[in-house]
Amino acid sequence: MRPLTPRQAEILDLIKRNIADTGMPPTRAEIARRLGFKSANAAEEHLKALAKKGCIEIMPGTSRGIKLTQEEEPEDLGLPLIGQVAAGEPILAQEHVEQHYQVDPSMFRPSADFLLRVRGDSMKDIGILEGDLLAVHKVEQARNGQIVVARVEDDVTVKRFEKRGSTVYLHAENEEYSPIVVDLTTQSLSIEGLAVGVIRNGDWQ
């Protein structure tokens, strides 16, 4: 392999750490933000250079289309468990990862990308309980009726998704809780993933 420049080595290390911590590569925008580039295009140029040197493969058509070559593949650390999520930061940002669990992502359909510890009892009627580890498949869109991990403004919540026009209703599965109503014309909402399974608290240490 041809030698890397210091900047290329820094980017390659960032990619490896992101995959080890979150199970997926960073986006171009995330690379640019973390390393202080002015735009995602600057990150793209460095990625092309790494691809030419045989460190990575670039897969077109996806923001996370970066694959390490076999000799660069990091050790599998398992699924990351996400803790408290800081305002404005990606849910899979490295600083949010509390630890990793040796759970096979293919146990779930679709496969899980990360785990989220359940807080509260708002989803207890469908068996999602306080302290459970919720297996989550990373997506950015959802269909009505799906159980989602959603970010409303700066809060992350697990609820059943329903969209009517420009209004989203995030329904609890506990009659003691009212729906969270989000007016998309004035509030920000993003889907962080779909719930694909539960690991009961105490079943996996």
Swiss-Prot record:
<dbReference type="InterPro" id="IPR006200">
    <property type="entry name" value="LexA"/>
</dbReference>
<dbReference type="InterPro" id="IPR036390">
    <property type="entry name" value="WH_DNA-bd_sf"/>
</dbReference>
<dbReference type="InterPro" id="IPR050077">
    <property type="entry name" value="LexA_repressor"/>
</dbReference>
<feature type="active site" description="For autocatalytic cleavage activity">
    <location>
        <position position="122"/>
    </location>
</feature>
<dbReference type="InterPro" id="IPR015927">
    <property type="entry name" value="Peptidase_S24_S26A/B/C"/>
</dbReference>
<keyword id="KW-0238">DNA-binding</keyword>
<dbReference type="GO" id="GO:0003677">
    <property type="term" value="F:DNA binding"/>
</dbReference>
<feature type="active site" description="For autocatalytic cleavage activity">
    <location>
        <position position="159"/>
    </location>
</feature>
<comment type="function">
    <text>Represses a number of genes involved in the response to DNA damage (SOS response), including recA and lexA. In the presence of single-stranded DNA, RecA interacts with LexA causing an autocatalytic cleavage which disrupts the DNA-binding part of LexA, leading to derepression of the SOS regulon and eventually DNA repair.</text>
</comment>
<dbReference type="GO" id="GO:0006260">
    <property type="term" value="P:DNA replication"/>
</dbReference>
<dbReference type="GO" id="GO:0045892">
    <property type="term" value="P:negative regulation of DNA-templated transcription"/>
</dbReference>
<dbReference type="InterPro" id="IPR006199">
    <property type="entry name" value="LexA_DNA-bd_dom"/>
</dbReference>
<keyword id="KW-0234">DNA repair</keyword>
<protein>
    <recommendedName>
        <fullName>LexA repressor</fullName>
        <ecNumber>3.4.21.88</ecNumber>
    </recommendedName>
</protein>
<comment type="subunit">
    <text>Homodimer.</text>
</comment>
<feature type="DNA-binding region" description="H-T-H motif">
    <location>
        <begin position="28"/>
        <end position="48"/>
    </location>
</feature>
<keyword id="KW-0805">Transcription regulation</keyword>
<dbReference type="GO" id="GO:0006281">
    <property type="term" value="P:DNA repair"/>
</dbReference>
<keyword id="KW-0378">Hydrolase</keyword>
<dbReference type="InterPro" id="IPR006197">
    <property type="entry name" value="Peptidase_S24_LexA"/>
</dbReference>
<dbReference type="GO" id="GO:0004252">
    <property type="term" value="F:serine-type endopeptidase activity"/>
</dbReference>
<dbReference type="InterPro" id="IPR039418">
    <property type="entry name" value="LexA-like"/>
</dbReference>
<dbReference type="Pfam" id="PF00717">
    <property type="entry name" value="Peptidase_S24"/>
</dbReference>
<keyword id="KW-0068">Autocatalytic cleavage</keyword>
<comment type="similarity">
    <text>Belongs to the peptidase S24 family.</text>
</comment>
<keyword id="KW-0804">Transcription</keyword>
<keyword id="KW-0742">SOS response</keyword>
<dbReference type="GO" id="GO:0006508">
    <property type="term" value="P:proteolysis"/>
</dbReference>
<dbReference type="InterPro" id="IPR036388">
    <property type="entry name" value="WH-like_DNA-bd_sf"/>
</dbReference>
<dbReference type="Pfam" id="PF01726">
    <property type="entry name" value="LexA_DNA_bind"/>
</dbReference>
<keyword id="KW-0235">DNA replication</keyword>
<keyword id="KW-0227">DNA damage</keyword>
<dbReference type="InterPro" id="IPR036286">
    <property type="entry name" value="LexA/Signal_pep-like_sf"/>
</dbReference>
<dbReference type="GO" id="GO:0009432">
    <property type="term" value="P:SOS response"/>
</dbReference>
<keyword id="KW-0678">Repressor</keyword>
<feature type="site" description="Cleavage; by autolysis">
    <location>
        <begin position="87"/>
        <end position="88"/>
    </location>
</feature>
